[in-house]
Design a protein with these regions (language model features):
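Residue-level recognition of well-ordered beta-strand positions that form the cores
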Residues: 8-14, 53, 69-73, 100-106, ...
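Intrinsically disordered, low-complexity acidic/polar segments
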Residues: 20, 61, 79, 90, ...
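Generic short beta-strand segments
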Residues: 48-57, 82-87, 117-121
């Protein structure tokens, strides 16, 4: 049985100082992604590609450890991130795990705005065969929402600080 669940978050960050330089800052893809995600969990895989180890979590006493290859590009002033490939450690051999990530971030007249969609489809693990599908999907939705909220919180705290550091470094 295939389980599917997703979560979505929007972001609006007010930036008052040097906001005219936000578009240039977003061109620093590696730096921006490092500020948005935990840079210690990012491994560069080439230009515009990183492998990211998502913070592990427990679901029904199972340790879950997603690893995602992420493509990053700045297109028309919008920083876009998407999942290229993903693996799931912690549930034994799962061949049909599919993670969808679509996120964007752009400079606006108020500061930075963006949104992220995170989705998963996976077959029901044998260890969870007795748990009803609705409960598993509801739990999955909550977990994904928690991941996105954690990233959103980090972005709200870290991204503006990193932007101001970047401005200082570039004597803006």
């Amino acid at each position: 049985m295939i389980l599917s669940f997703d979560a979505k978050q929007k972001l609006k960050l007010s930036v008052t100082r040097n906001k005219d330089y936000l578009s240039k800052y977003l061109l620093e893809e590696e730096r921006v992604v490092g500020a948005m995600l935990d840079s210690k969990k990012l491994v560069p895989e080439g230009v515009g590609r990183d492998k990211y180890t998502v913070t592990s979590f427990k679901v029904f006493q199972l340790d879950i450890n997603p690893v995602v290859s992420i493509a990053v590009e700045n297109k028309d002033g919008i920083l876009k991130m998407s999942a290229l490939d993903s693996t799931l450690d912690g549930l034994g051999i799962i061949d049909d795990f599919n993670l969808i990530l679509k996120a964007n971030l752009e400079a606006t007249n108020i500061g930075l705005e963006g949104e992220a969609l995170l989705g998963v489809s996976v077959s029901q693990p044998p260890l969870l065969k007795l748990v009803p599908k609705k409960i598993l999907e509801s739990t999955g939705h909550s977990v994904l929402n928690g991941i996105l909220l954690g990233i959103k919180s980090r972005v709200q705290q870290q991204l503006v600080k990193d932007f101001l550091d970047w401005c200082e470094l570039n004597k803006i």
